[in-house]
């Protein structure tokens, strides 16, 4: 399912450890990561996953910006990452890749079961970045809902071969 914060890495790991396909909702993973870091990341789970991220400079930048030891004050607002657009800044691209990596890495940690990432075809701007992060964490399955994902197989093949990929965005309105 696409339950943001419900179909997360913990549930996906538990389902996968029971011999079924555990699925992480890929929607708003960047927001979930940054908010949980600002809540202090009790137990250090997210920081441990970021330490395994293959681009340490990106992980450091995320931690420097969003991690608050002990958590933010209850009345303090969250620092919210910018909304992703068709040309996101480098820092946001890194955050989306890392957040997808973290979710899949944690869902797969400590077992050999299958873990998938579920993305929505209609939310296209983070798709390439989320797929790349999930593939870095060795995601087993990619599921796509809310549309026909015609471009996704080629993108996955390109990333698997170590090549860059691109995706055309559907634009409506004026």
What is each of the regions a protein language model found here?
Residues 1-174:
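Active-site entrance/lid segments in N-terminal catalytic domains of soluble metabolic enzymes
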């Amino acid at each position: 399912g696409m339950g943001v914060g419900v179909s997360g890495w913990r549930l996906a790991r538990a389902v996968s450890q029971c011999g079924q396909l555990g699925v992480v909702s890929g929607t708003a993973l960047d927001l979930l990561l940054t908010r949980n870091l600002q809540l202090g990341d009790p137990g250090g789970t997210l920081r441990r996953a970021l330490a395994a991220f293959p681009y340490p400079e990106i992980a450091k930048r995320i931690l420097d910006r969003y991690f608050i030891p002990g958590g933010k004050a209850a009345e303090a607002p969250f620092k919210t990452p910018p909304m992703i657009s068709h040309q996101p800044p480098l820092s946001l691209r890194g955050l989306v890749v890392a957040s997808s990596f973290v979710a899949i890495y944690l869902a797969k940690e400590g077992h050999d079961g299958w873990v998938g990432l579920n993305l929505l075809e209609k939310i296209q701007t983070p798709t390439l970045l989320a797929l790349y992060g999930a593939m870095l964490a060795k995601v087993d399955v990619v599921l796509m809902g809310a549309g026909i994902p015609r471009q996704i197989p080629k993108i996955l093949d390109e990333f698997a071969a170590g090549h860059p990929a691109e995706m055309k965005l559907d634009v409506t309105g004026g």
